[in-house]
A protein has these predicted regions:
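Loop/turn-to-beta-strand initiation segments
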Residues: 28-29, 61, 88-91, 129-138
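Conserved P-loop
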Residues: 1-79
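Conserved acidic residues
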Residues: 60, 90, 158, 162
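Conserved, well-folded catalytic cores of nucleic-acid-processing
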Residues: 7, 22-26, 47-54, 80-83, ...
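Conserved nucleotide-binding/hydrolysis micro-motifs of P-loop NTPases
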Residues: 36-39, 68-73, 98-100, 142-146, ...
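Short amphipathic alpha-helical segments
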Residues: 44-45, 104-106, 149-150
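Phosphate-binding/switch loop-helix module in NTP-utilizing enzymes
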Residues: 65-131
């Protein structure tokens, strides 16, 4: 499980859609769980055309699901293996992991419940990833910590993902920094996606 977090417009959704597209292009099935309504099939087709890939059937191996609540999001992961459309997915993308949790359980008064539910959700995903050899790509928003920006979900997310990458927008480029190690790469945004 890998988390990509950053401010709005830092390239999280772009990266998530491109990962699903690359999985599809490689002959794998992907499940794209959209919590914010940001999935755009026409953008995927544009990336494929710009890269010289055919678009026929390319989106047939990307299963799209929109979730509007934390319970719906959690239930989808719990039942994924038993459903024909999703059990063969080798990549699961959740864009954005914490959105439904912060919407359903807002404010400091709900922090313990929110973090507990998020912990259960992440633990179930980690178990599914291990048992079914499935990769998870999670996008996340940021909040301001005592010193710098941190991904929403804090230690709960940090402890259960295998890697976290902070994305920062720099003009038409995006810098990805591995947290906490600090190594980074700079990639360009364009018609063909992130290069």
């Amino acid at each position: 499980m890998v988390e990509f977090f950053g401010r709005s417009n830092s390239g999280k959704t772009q990266l998530a859609m491109q990962a699903a597209l690359c999985a599809s292009r490689s002959g794998f099935r992907a499940l794209f769980v959209d919590t914010e309504g940001s999935f755009r099939p026409e953008r995927l087709e544009g990336i494929a055309r710009a890269r010289g890939w055919g678009t026929a059937g390319l989106l047939d191996t990307i299963v799209y699901v929109r979730t509007d609540s934390a319970s719906e999001q959690m239930e989808l992961i719990r039942r994924m293996q038993g459903r024909e459309a999703t059990k063969e997915c080798q990549l699961v993308v959740i864009d954005t992991l914490t959105r439904n949790f912060t919407t359903d359980m807002p404010g400091r008064q709900n922090l313990a419940g929110r973090q507990g539910a998020l912990n259960v959700h992440l633990s179930e995903m980690a178990r599914d990833a291990y048992i079914n050899a499935r990769a998870y790509l999670l996008t996340n928003r940021v909040t301001f910590g005592p010193v710098h920006e941190v991904g929403i979900g804090g230690r709960t997310v940090e402890q259960l993902v295998h890697a976290s990458v902070r994305l920062d927008r720099e003009g038409h480029s995006v810098r990805g920094t591995l947290v906490p190690e600090g190594g980074s790469i700079l990639a360009e945004f364009g018609e063909s996606g992130i290069d």
